[in-house]
């Protein structure tokens, strides 16, 4: 689960570079939306990873 959190963080950083520096041109708004969605998914995945690490449950 923590690997997904890092993946979402990388996606968020890439979206931020493309969206906030105006490199993407017309895709700025889409990049900003992807950035915020990826940040939310990163936070959820990080919290779930830490919670699952604390429990001894495995799937």
UniProtKB/Swiss-Prot annotation:
Pfam families: DUF1328. GO terms for cellular component: plasma membrane. The keyword Cell membrane applies. Keywords: Cell membrane, Membrane, Transmembrane, Transmembrane helix. The chain crosses the membrane at residues 4-24, 30-50. It comes from the Bacteria. It is a multi-pass membrane protein. Its main location: membrane. Belongs to the UPF0391 family. This is UPF0391 membrane protein AZC_4184. It comes from Azorhizobium caulinodans (strain ATCC 43989 / DSM 5975 / JCM 20966 / LMG 6465 / NBRC 14845 / NCIMB 13405 / ORS 571). The lineage of its organism: Bacteria, Pseudomonadati, Pseudomonadota, Alphaproteobacteria, Hyphomicrobiales.
